[in-house]
């Protein structure tokens, strides 16, 4: 349901109107229970069909098993958990929701810097198909710039999101380099070296696929860039990895 706030509405009154829980309405809309509402504000309100009150000794895994669900699905249906798997006795979980038939499938990718906060990362991972650590830069000679992506890859695997390796021309100064792109695209030996290192890195770290992000490529090199991406795709597809 979409509820438009009227004068006198509170989270509690809105939740009661839709047979929902105030804490769920708050979490699903990025609010806290003490956040003041504004007249005309639109809120998403979901009506739980089945609720489960956590008992002593229960875990997210045990509850998911009891209802024949995956932990990932249970986390998705309880955004207020923000991805945390540690439950407290008395927590109320939504097992399913009324009138929520699947509409289809959707693939969702998110980019993350290595320094992203753990709480924010864990809160979104249950909803992601892919997580892409940002970013592996390159030198003109076709050498990958290192990326401290171990934590991101570990969290992605824990929450069932596939990891994509991000290849770009971003420099340590934070700018996309046309010069680095041009040097690489006109040097077959550098491309071969880069391709070999990409394959090695993906195999070592367990990356699912590759995301190529070269920005500000000179117009006269557009065909060289297309050929380079085709070369990457051919080599990685042979290893079962998408580009």
Task: List each language-model region with its residue ranges.
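Soluble periplasmic/extracytoplasmic beta-strand elements of cell-envelope proteins
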Residues: 3-6, 42-46, 53-55, 73, ...
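Boundary/entry segment of secreted carbohydrate-active catalytic domains
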Residues: 49-52, 95-120
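Chitinase-like catalytic core of GlcNAc-active glycosidases
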Residues: 102-114, 125, 139-243
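Solvent-exposed, polar/charged alpha-helical surfaces in well-ordered, non-transmembrane soluble domains
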Residues: 12-16, 23, 61-65, 72, ...
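Primarily a LysM-type cell-wall glycan-binding module
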Residues: 1-19, 41-68, 91
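Short acidic beta-strand-loop surface patches of small beta-rich interaction domains
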Residues: 26-34, 75-83
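Flexible loop residues that form catalytic
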Residues: 79, 98, 136, 215
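Short, structured interface segments
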Residues: 29-47, 86-98
